[in-house]
């Protein structure tokens, strides 16, 4: 373990703003502002202030520069000057992840706006409320291939929940209020607001609150009672039910209701990658995460179930495996606020469209009214599942070459930082190990890019989470591949006084790609060696120091606990720990892409035969 080299203290450390006491949907504030004549840019800033925004992540540029002038005078808005627009988008997403409030990012036209495409697609796929404000060339230049012109509305139409091109300054308050409402209501998502430069520079009439005009947008939040009653009947008749829980339970603030339903009925629970923390890992009914790298018990529960109670989940291919062999004997209750998700991948015997908290609350009342909980017979089912859980627990062994095990590092980090910390992962092996070996007890304590699988997500998302929760310990768990995509945002953290901590799982490779090459391409390791082991290029400790962080390195198991505690003791600047781990470590269990969940391997060459586990039930 190398000794830390502490960089000079940053010269500028603004106090972080806390979002703890802000309303989740501040657009509903009753405050009225009389008519005023402002520039369009001033109207943007005033609207954001009235909407309760406290932080914006962005970079100025020509087309959006008019907004930055009144921003300079705002006493309510903190602006975080990121080093790349992708960082702004992911930081806004991280902020929204942990608070449930809308995250805001801002960029100029052309390349500034196009650099937001990936984070907007990421937020949309994972149902994260984000509003991006982009400058655009003047209205008279649109369509002329003007300098830094890009049709960002057209580009982002397929990857956002909605987007706007503002054509009149008078529309700015209404459009921004609508954007926030759309982003945060129903199924949350990403919204883009594109504003031409001449609209920002021109005069407009400002008043607040504006009258929103969204006649075609009415999310159905109240579930149909008849459907809930039918769901209760299926639950009463089931003998092998499973609560299949997705990220919508967290987005819908329904985790307490989920626990009440689970404990009332005694039904086993599986939580998808996006739902880790929705149900406590310490709870005896929690079977863990299902899917490609899920627990054998969770996968077995879905495959052998006779009833799936799917709550706020979308039957993603990484959970279902080969769809026509997924849960072949199960009937399906599918509750989701987005009607487009119901029946999209799996037929629902009882579809329920509505807010998941309302669905669960009404379902609990229905079950109690009909005295159903005491009639569900699941002794054999639980005996079977406990047998699977006992036979195939999540585990890992030492590396054959004696190198540091990444699973050990992540497991120890989770134990030491504890359930009150927030963990943010990039994408790849380290993401899966963090999902598997850290025990999540609370919602919004686990952030990752689940749907889009965006490398480079962790550092900027952790930055956004730390700004939202300045009193919470925030760890970015990143791989050496992901880290090299967005590590420049550590300079932002150092300058802005955002003391995130980074556990860098450095295996010298694009680890997940290398694992697939090992399993499916005869160990032909084409273009996956990053040279971060063989040449130490870059030297991550030196890089961390150059970015204004403390840099640490750990290569031995006996040093892991000490170096984590050393990092935890540093709270005035960011810290990066370069964990040198084995290059050949692999993520298990695994269901190969495109195959049936029945073909899960607990470890390489070890395939559980679910029907042979006969402790009480086959």
Swiss-Prot record:
Cofactor binding note: Binds 1 Mg(2+) ion per subunit. Binds 1 thiamine pyrophosphate per subunit.
Entries under Pfam families matching the protein: TPP_enzyme_C, TPP_enzyme_M, TPP_enzyme_N
GO BP annotations, alphabetical order: branched-chain amino acid biosynthetic process; isoleucine biosynthetic process; L-valine biosynthetic process
Gene that produces this protein: ilvB1
Protein name: Acetolactate synthase large subunit IlvB1
Species of origin: Mycobacterium tuberculosis (strain ATCC 25618 / H37Rv)
Ranges where the record places region Disordered: 1-30
Lineage: Bacteria, Bacillati, Actinomycetota, Actinomycetes, Mycobacteriales
MF-aspect GO terms: acetolactate synthase activity; flavin adenine dinucleotide binding; magnesium ion binding; thiamine pyrophosphate binding
Family named by the database record: Belongs to the TPP enzyme family.
Keyword Magnesium: yes
């Amino acid at each position: 373990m190398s000794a830390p080299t502490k960089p000079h203290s940053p010269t500028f450390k603004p106090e972080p703003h806390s979002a703890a006491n802000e309303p989740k949907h501040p657009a509903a504030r009753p405050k009225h502002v009389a008519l005023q004549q402002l520039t369009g840019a001033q109207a943007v800033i005033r609207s954001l202030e009235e909407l309760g925004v406290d932080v914006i992540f962005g970079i100025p540029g020509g087309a959006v520069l008019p907004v930055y002038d009144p921003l300079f005078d705002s006493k309510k808005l903190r602006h975080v000057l990121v080093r790349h627009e992708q960082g702004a988008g992911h930081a806004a997403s991280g902020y929204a992840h942990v608070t449930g409030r809308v995250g805001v990012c801002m960029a100029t036209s052309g390349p500034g706006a196009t650099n937001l495409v990936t984070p907007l697609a990421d937020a949309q796929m994972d149902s994260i409320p984000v509003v991006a404000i982009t400058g655009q060339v003047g209205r008279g230049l649109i369509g002329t291939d003007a300098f830094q012109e890009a049709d960002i509305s057209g580009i982002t139409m397929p990857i956002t929940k909605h987007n706007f091109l503002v054509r009149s300054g008078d529309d700015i308050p209404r459009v921004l209020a609508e954007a926030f409402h759309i982003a945060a209501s129903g199924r949350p998502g990403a919204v883009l607001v594109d504003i031409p430069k001449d609209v920002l520079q021109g005069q407009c009439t400002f008043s607040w609150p504006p009258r929103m005009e969204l006649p075609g947008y009415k999310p159905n939040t109240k579930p149909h009672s008849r459907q809930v009653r039918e769901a209760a009947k299926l639950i009463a008749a089931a003998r092998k039910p499973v609560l299949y829980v997705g990220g919508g339970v967290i987005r819908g603030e329904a985790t307490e209701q989920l626990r009440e339903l689970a404990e009332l009925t005694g039904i086993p629970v599986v939580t998808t990658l996006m739902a880790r923390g929705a149900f406590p890992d310490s709870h005896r009914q929690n079977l863990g995460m299902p899917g490609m790298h899920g627990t054998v018990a969770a996968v077995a529960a879905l495959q052998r179930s006779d009833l799936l109670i799917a709550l706020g989940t979308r039957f993603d291919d990484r959970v279902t495996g080969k769809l026509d062999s997924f849960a072949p004997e199960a009937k399906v209750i599918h509750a989701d606020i987005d009607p487009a998700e119901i029946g999209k991948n799996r037929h629902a015997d009882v579809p329920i469209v509505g807010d998941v908290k309302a669905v669960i609350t009404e379902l609990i009342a229905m079950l109690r009214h009909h005295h159903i909980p005491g009639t569900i017979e699941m002794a054999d089912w639980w005996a079977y599942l406990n047998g699977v859980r006992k036979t195939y627990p999540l585990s890992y062994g030492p590396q054959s070459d004696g190198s540091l095990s990444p699973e050990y590092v992540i497991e120890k980090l989770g134990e030491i930082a504890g359930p009150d910390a927030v963990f943010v992962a990039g994408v790849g092996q380290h993401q899966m190990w963090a999902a598997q070996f850290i025990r999540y007890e609370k919602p919004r304590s686990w952030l990752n890019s689940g749907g889009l699988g965006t490398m480079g997500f962790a550092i900027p998302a952790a930055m956004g989470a730390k700004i939202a929760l300045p009193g919470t310990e925030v760890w970015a768990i990143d791989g050496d591949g992901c880290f090299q995509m967005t590590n420049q945002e550590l300079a932002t953290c150092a300058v802005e006084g955002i003391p995130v901590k980074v556990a860098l799982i450095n295996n010298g490779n694009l680890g997940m790609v290398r694992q697939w090459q090992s399993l499916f391409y005869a160990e032909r390791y084409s273009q996956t060696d990053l040279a971060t082991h063989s040449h130490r290029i870059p030297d991550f400790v030196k890089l961390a120091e150059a970015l204004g962080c403390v840099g640490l390195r750990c290569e031995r198991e006996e040093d892991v606990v000490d170096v984590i505690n050393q990092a935890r003791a540093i709270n005035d600047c960011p810290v990066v720990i370069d964990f040198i781990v084995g290059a050949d470590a692999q993520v298990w269990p695994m269901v190969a892409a495109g195959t049936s969940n029945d073909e899960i391997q607990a470890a390489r060459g070890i395939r559980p035969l679910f029907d042979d586990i006969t402790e009480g039930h086959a």
